[in-house]
Amino acid sequence: MNNYKLQAPYQPNGDQPKAIKKLVQGVNSGEEFQTLLGATGTGKTFTIANVIQQTGRPALILAHNKTLAAQLCNELRQFFPKNAVEYFISYYDYYQPEAYVPVSDTYIAKTASINEEIDMLRHSATRSLFERKDVIVVASISCIYGLGIPSEYLKAAVKFAVGESIDLRSSLRALVDNQYTRNDTEITRGRFRIKGDVLEIGPAYEDRLIRIELFGDEIEAIRFVDPLTGEILESLDQVSVYPAKHFVTPKERLDSAISAIRNELKEQLDKFAYEGKLLEAQRLEQRTKYDLEMLREVGYCNGVENYARHLAGREEGTPPECLIDYFPKDWLLVVDESHVTCPQLHAMYNGDQARKKVLIDHGFRLPSAADNRPLKCEEFWEKSRQTLFISATPGQWELDQCEGKFIEQVIRPTGVLDPIIDVRPSDGQIDDLLSEIRVRAKKNQRVLVTTLTKRMAEDLTDFLSDNKVRVRYLHSEIHSIERIEIIQDLRLGEYDVLVGVNLLREGLDLPEVSLVAILDADKEGFLRAERSLIQTIGRAARHVEGVALLYADNFTESMKRAISETDRRRTIQKKYNQINGITPKPAGKKIENSILSFLELSRKLDTGGLSKDLINIVSNKTDDILNAKDNQCLLDEMPSLIDKLENKMKDAAKELNFEEAANLRDRIKKLRQKLSRNT
């Protein structure tokens, strides 16, 4: 049964109906690989949403970074508000992997900081995959890393049903075995408490509490309740409480794992002794024996993931089970921006193994640590059954899987044509660019400029700034959150020009950009290859007056192919518009605060130095501000404010001031609603 309910204020048009029909036919007929070659701004996400809705398959959408994953997740949640659209990325705010540098004899211990909200979203994704069919998971490449054993995770779930009799002591023990901790004072995710005949659990995948009310040994009621006020939110007939961690190891398997680790240790020590590596042997023996003692006593140790092969009972060299293994058999894989995502996917294993080999060779880890790894590319494709590659510039590998066939989508619903390409000589290019920027600035339009080196970008930024141009410089050292802010400021008109080395960022959605300038376009290389040029030119493809300026003294083969492809698309688009009487119109798109930006901004932004409006909100003077015309400054600071109010709400609840906590909760709810309306 197809439970997907697609909601959109418009119907497929342009090339979308044809692309949707062909993709659906391919999926239903069992085609293993298909490629959608969709030009920038043609509505590829909406096309994929329709394919998912019509095929009714659970879907994994793979993006090559968490920012794009968040953008996709937001869009799909708007299309499928009644279905489960989940977000699965690495839950580390900060991660420094364990490493050893032999040249300087430097050991670097693993350090990491886990984002609890993202961890909750990851658990929500796996819970949804177990409990329903209408599930779309938008994930980053982190989904190819080990994620426990799905069968053990499901088997370990503690089930409760109204009317059933339970042994409370056994249920509490099961929760502890599933890595929940008892705390009768403060309950949060991964904790539970028991008061009289009421058991309350903070599940790993919810921000609500599960309250189980008992009458003797019989379950009288099961409810979702607000963790701060105790307000009943929903009544249930039954509920499954999944483990607090994805890695679940039964007692019998832990015992056999300890035995296997001990045997492997003996073999490796004998090997080191034979090779005369006495220091390495001592180092390995000391560390591993300590880890074994910790595993025996508490079932956990630092770096426990390095023993994952033994704890999972896998054979040497076999692939780990990951998010993909939580999907049912008939799932659908969608690889977004496949020309970037596929190479990234194929490179993950080799990079991981190079680091692990050094640790193993120098006695920091057992050889089995090498099996705590991402999937190899061939293992990944063996697990996937049907795949849709999505890109404006598909790579050769993807096209080879489809035997060179692809489905094209070049008509934009807005009727906007691909940018006009204007090739100009490099002599006097900076003065020429400055005059073009001033023309756009007067029209309240934006400009992107891409250079070949950081030094050139810095010098150009300084020159433009000295000439009274509002300009910013985007480079690799800027944190991803600051990058989001810079892009939002460009759209808001805080400045007119963005300069960078590599602005071809796939998925960068900037409808206000009318001019893209590519300096040194005739210098062959990665940044001026055909695909890079097409992607960069495409940044101006959402504007009615879109133009791409290529400064070059020669026509390279890459330039010729990129110009030819752009002209071909313009011809098709222009003809379609003439036949159908379509006048190009701007692609108006609201400025978004993505899931990712909201999560990280709410955690990281300084809550000090709030604006007057925000001070009024903290002082409970919210109604006038919330009902007033949108204040962008307020919107920008809102995630920080929500974080501040949540802390005040928790403090009020701890002090048993539930009336104040409820009042703060309602204000936070208003703020979240305002934020969602304007994103």
Curated annotation (Swiss-Prot):
Function: The UvrABC repair system catalyzes the recognition and processing of DNA lesions. A damage recognition complex composed of 2 UvrA and 2 UvrB subunits scans DNA for abnormalities. Upon binding of the UvrA(2)B(2) complex to a putative damaged site, the DNA wraps around one UvrB monomer. DNA wrap is dependent on ATP binding by UvrB and probably causes local melting of the DNA helix, facilitating insertion of UvrB beta-hairpin between the DNA strands. Then UvrB probes one DNA strand for the presence of a lesion.
UniProt GO molecular function: ATP binding; ATP hydrolysis activity; DNA binding; excinuclease ABC activity
GO CC term, one of those recorded: cytoplasm
Family (UniProt): Belongs to the UvrB family.
Pfam families according to UniProt: Helicase_C, ResIII, UVR, UvrB, UvrB_inter
GO biological process: nucleotide-excision repair; SOS response
Locations listed in the record: Cytoplasm
Motif (Beta-hairpin): 91-114
Residues the entry annotates as binding ATP: 38-45
Domain remarks: The beta-hairpin motif is involved in DNA binding.
Primary subcellular site in the record, as a coarse category: cytoplasm
Entry protein name: UvrABC system protein B
Gene3D superfamilies named in the record: P-loop containing nucleotide triphosphate hydrolases, UVR domain
All residue ranges annotated as the Helicase ATP-binding domain in the record: 25-412
Domain (UVR): residue spans on this chain: 639-674
Assembly, per entry: Forms a heterotetramer with UvrA during the search for lesions. Interacts with UvrC in an incision complex.
Keywords, in A-Z order: ATP-binding, Cytoplasm, DNA damage, DNA excision, DNA repair, Excision nuclease, Nucleotide-binding, SOS response
Helicase C-terminal domain span: 429-583
